[in-house]
Amino acid sequence: TVTIIQYCIMLVVAATAFAFNFTSKKALKTLLLAISVIGLIIFCYMGYMRQSAETIFAVFPLLAVGITPILGKVVDNKGKAATMLMFGSILLIVCHLTFAFILPLFKGSAIGGVLIAYVTILILGASFSLVPASLWPSVPKLVDQRVIGSAYALIFWIQNIGLWLFPLLIGKVLDNTNPQVVNDLKNHVITPEQAAVSYDYTWPLVMLACLGGAALVIGVILKRVDKVKGLGLELPNVQQ
């Protein structure tokens, strides 16, 4: 029952955040934003009361669902796509390093650890909104219109390679940095459930932070190229 209620709250947050972009009435915009924020808080509180890891991870897409339409409207009307890409990359780095080094310091803290986990996962969701909301509208400005379909296909091709490859790499890094856990699991000293909470996830998280660093470098390069060649990445899509 609680899970169904949380799903309903998620739909309310998504709907109100999306509708926020398509109304010009200030009072209605404020009401929609308030409903979205209150729904998000209630969702997090219900997850905290359940004290389960999946409820924390379930928050990950929730803020992304809420703010992606808003960020898309910002890019359309204000521009700054390359800057948003860089900012999203910085948030990716900070969040993964927080999970790797700061969150373990609060192990055993029922309030502090859960609070940091929720805040970090929400910010991580926001970073996942910043990157696509700025990346996709920028593609037509970077490639010839005749090959724009191929450009999008190439992006998704590379993305799917990453979705296939990096879970394998993370698993390999996890095994190589936790040989004792792997041996205990192989010798049936511990169960897979016990192994999952015994692994040290520091290095896989550092690896993901490095990917954020690579994205930040690419963002800096794009902003530099845009400044030199005038591609219009920082300009709004809607010209007055």
Predicted regions and their residues:
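Multi-pass alpha-helical transporter architecture, strongest
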Residues: N21, A100, A195-Q239
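A late C-terminal transmembrane helix in Major Facilitator Superfamily
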Residues: Q145-P179
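Residue-level signature of mid-helix packing/kink "hotspots" within the transmembrane helices
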Residues: P61-P69, N160, W164
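C-terminal transmembrane helical hairpin of 12-TM major facilitator-type secondary transporters
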Residues: G47, S52, A58-P61, A81-L135
